[in-house]
Amino acid sequence: MADFKVEYPAPYCLAPAAIEAKTEAAGVTKANLPVAKAFLLAMFAGAFIAFGGLFFTVFLSDSTLGWGAQRVVGGLCFCLGLVLVLVCGAELFTGNSLMVCALKSKKITLVQMLKAWVVVWVGNFVGALFIVFLVYMAGIYKLNGEAVANSMVSVAAGKVTIDWVTIFFRGILCNIFVCLAVWIGTAGKTVVDKVVGILLPIAAFVACGFEHCVANMYFLPMGAVMHACGYGAKVAGADALNAAGIAFNLSAATLGNIVGGAVLVALGYWFIYAKKSEA
């Protein structure tokens, strides 16, 4: 009688333990990137997230939709940024919080991780500022009867008129969603898998108004430039769109993002799937 071998189809996505292992490997790669390459990839990520932010503010300039629908669809527009980061390849500070998995498994050192974080944070900011320059020179803010410019000021002003602690906790919530989106994207085996997996977590954090430090590297300078050009004069809090206001927001959002991504997501999943049992 002939022997029949039963072949089972490969799973459509990685299991959580395999995602953690892949995340550790990615952390090692990130930690060993030459500074110039890491910085350039970080600039790409800052630019990509800025593209998502631009798409978001252009959409928000149309006030015909109700508040809830506008936030949800605007969040879907913003997804463009992380889709470009994951599919095209770039170094995003918030996603790099997951390097803690590699750190805890002693595959990289604390110095390597912190160095990578600093290089990527600065690179993200430079990339975002470059897009602010391009958007200004291209006159995108003049669209929809200059309503886009007012939308840019409104979004930015809303981020500098809340207290530091609130921004910090919104930053924690934000990077929980972002790192889970990256986690899902890592699980996917095709471009479609990655894109679909990203949509809901990213749309949710944007719709809820959480604080993403890299997105704010675009939103805040863009709003400040528009306010300096005379737009959004009647927007509450617009006068706080200056260097101090930007630093105030980014300090809280950055620290909150680190706690949300590195401590709550990365450390949690490392403990579950990679921590060695003690005899």
What function would you assign to each model-found segment?
Residues A2-A279:
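Alpha-helical transmembrane segments and their helix-helix packing motifs
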